[in-house]
Amino acid sequence: MELERATELVEYLNKTLYIDGDRVIPNIKHQIIKLDGLSKLLVSGLIDNNSMELKKGHYAHENALTTVVPNRNSIFASIVYAVALSVVKRTGEKCQIALGTHMGDFDNKTQTGIYPDCSEEFRTALEHAFKIGNWDSDKVDYYAPYNITDKTGVLKDGIDSCEYFNLDFKEIYSRTNTSYAPIYVGFIDGNDMLERGVWLSDYKSGSSVERIESFIKLGLEDPLQYAEEDGTLVSWDFVKKYVT
């Protein structure tokens, strides 16, 4: 689901992006890197056909530990850093990479959170290892811009970016899905939205709850369609009531 949504969103942005009212060709690239076989070796509630059950609930609850993937961010960061070093080799220019962690993943002030590999301490240590272990590492900047804010701050920045690029935030965010337990619904007679089949979002998993809370805090309605596990559509008011 995430790959489908990411591909669709990149295609949409490449067709519709404007800056100060002028059409631009951003040439945003989306490349899929396969790690075939790795998922069979790891234990996590987020991995398909895994022995661990994905439990529902807020990140603040202990059951959210089922969403931990062993060493996830160092795996992703290592791959991206290797690509960045290769970009430096090919172009001779500096390269910048970013990790999308935030304080909802790990609070750097209180040193608490479900995901210690999202902490600034971990990111700094990993960057240090990358720099002492690679040539040309002085030409790669590796940072986590959202480690000083939570998911609400991330959403606010996304909305501000939509405004800057003259994008409809409802159109953009309806093309995203944050759910740990997405629901695929095929054709339903009489419902144009579901005519071709779409991915809907649950509203009970930790990632969905945090997203819903962020929209509520900003006084906005999430344009994403939420549903029960059986595919029954639920309203935004219903979702808000459940979360609050």
How would you describe each model-predicted region?
Residues 133, 148, 152, 161-201:
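Cys/His-rich Zn2+-binding cysteine-cluster or related metal-binding knuckle/ribbon modules and their
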Residues 183-200, 206-240:
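Iron-sulfur (Fe-S) cluster-binding segments and ferredoxin-like electron-carrier domains
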